[in-house]
Amino acid sequence: MNDLFSLAGKNILITGSAQGIGFLLATGLGKYGAQIIINDITAERAELAVEKLHQEGIQAVAAPFNVTHKHEIDAAVEHIEKDIGPIDVLVNNAGIQRRHPFTEFPEQEWNDVIAVNQTAVFLVSQAVTRHMVERKAGKVINICSMQSELGRDTITPYAASKGAVKMLTRGMCVELARHNIQVNGIAPGYFKTEMTKALVEDEAFTAWLCKRTPAARWGDPQELIGAAVFLSSKASDFVNGHLLFVDGGMLVAV
């Protein structure tokens, strides 16, 4: 049974993984035996994250590149495949958030959100899955959101990007499943992270969240690891095009 969830011998590339949820997933997946390929836009942050993983006894290497620049992505993926090893699992985690009322949202910030949260998923997935198709094996995990299904004030571009990633997940599944590639998404609910720090400190919002969520609390980021291990392992070999909500029941409550 343990082998069902083992990631020993697997190479997992996680975008935006030098900090935050990405680094948490890197640590969790690494403890199940995977070699983690840390990505960040800066080499310094990526190398620092690798050092931290090494201190935990986790195999890790750095692969710094900008997830919005196709030429950097293509070069980095070719380097990884040639010099590090085949990418068995890709986790599209990199993301940003910007907040403004819809009618005042700056066009450049809209473009930034779409570039990082949506277009980067397409570009990185395209580069990586070309190799997976050749091998007839691979897994892609797209980090989605509650906003893949629900809207919220001041973050319309974010919701638009995450809704698009949900449909990208399904479209990729339809095209890639025949090549033994599983493409799924994880949709976190409200977790205590750097990105949500302002909301966590907002007493009124926290009170609303606890009332709105059947579990009646914020999520602990550690609670995302199990979903990532499942979707990275052979336990999920016939799970495809699925969006796994880790949200304390929030989506199903009215």
Swiss-Prot record:
Enzyme Commission number(s) from the entry: 1.1.1.69
Pfam families xref list: adh_short (PF00106)
Residues annotated as catalytic: 158 (proton acceptor)
Reaction it catalyzes: D-gluconate + NAD(+) = 5-dehydro-D-gluconate + NADH + H(+); D-gluconate + NADP(+) = 5-dehydro-D-gluconate + NADPH + H(+)
GO biological process: L-idonate catabolic process
PROSITE patterns in UniProt: ADH_SHORT
Name under which the protein is recorded: 5-keto-D-gluconate 5-reductase
Enzyme class: oxidoreductase
UniProt keyword terms in alphabetical order: Carbohydrate metabolism, NAD, NADP, Oxidoreductase
Matches recorded under PANTHER family: 5-KETO-D-GLUCONATE 5-REDUCTASE
Residues at which substrate binds: 145
Binding of NADP(+), residues: 13-37
Induction line: Is up-regulated by L-idonate (15-fold) and by 5-ketogluconate (80-fold). Seems to be catabolite repressed. Is probably under the control of the positive regulator IdnR. Is part of the idnDOTR operon.
Any coiled-coil regions, as ranges: none
Function statement: Catalyzes the reduction of 5-keto-D-gluconate to D-gluconate, using either NADH or NADPH. Is likely involved in an L-idonate degradation pathway that allows E.coli to utilize L-idonate as the sole carbon and energy source. Is also able to catalyze the reverse reaction in vitro, but the D-gluconate oxidation by the enzyme can only proceed with NAD.
Pathway assigned to this chain's UniProt record: Carbohydrate acid metabolism; L-idonate degradation
A molecular function GO annotation: gluconate 5-dehydrogenase activity
Top-level taxon of origin: Bacteria
Family the UniProt entry places it in: Belongs to the short-chain dehydrogenases/reductases (SDR) family.
The UniProt record lists the keyword Glycosyltransferase: no
Keyword Oxidoreductase part of the UniProt annotation: yes
